[in-house]
Amino acid sequence: MSKNHPASSLQIKTPRLKLIPCPLDVAEASIFNPSLVAEILGAGVPKDWQKTEVQDFLPMYAQMLVDDPTSLGWGVWLMIQTQENTLIGDLGFGGKPDESGSLEIGYEVFAAYRNQGYGFEAVQALVNWAFSHPELKRLIAHCPIDNLASVRILEKLGMERLHLVEVPELPNTQVWKWQLRDLQIKK
């Protein structure tokens, strides 16, 4: 991705990662011509990225960016491992904070890169970025009760586990609802 690309100015760098808000051209390429994604990003893209959960969200996300270009940063972020210059996961939000200042975060690290601390490193950096915006008051996460790696990430972030929630799309499935308020963030 060129330095003149709109998403370049929002990059977040951590010791091992570069987080980039997914630009419209990458979202559209992923939907319509996946072979172009690596070229646009200037990074390696695993073939199994097309099978990740974020793919279902990309059409809605692309439309969100078309309707409101200032939404860049409040949707999908791409997690690039800098040493290999490879996409290793994605994370992000479902849009800008709502009227009450709440926002939901989600994340996924590809299987080959799990249990190496990348998830926490990325989520912590994105949480810090999000809470640098005064309109954000509360961050929400939903996590399957058996996803111990994600539970550890949420606990390390200082998120508070609230209660179990039913998943309407998946009968007999429950997830934990978590929250982090701006007052809990060390500034």
Placement of each model-derived feature along the sequence:
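GNAT-family acyltransferases
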Residues: M1-E104, V109-A112, A125-W129, H133, ...
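Glycine-rich acyl-CoA binding loop
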Residues: G117-F120
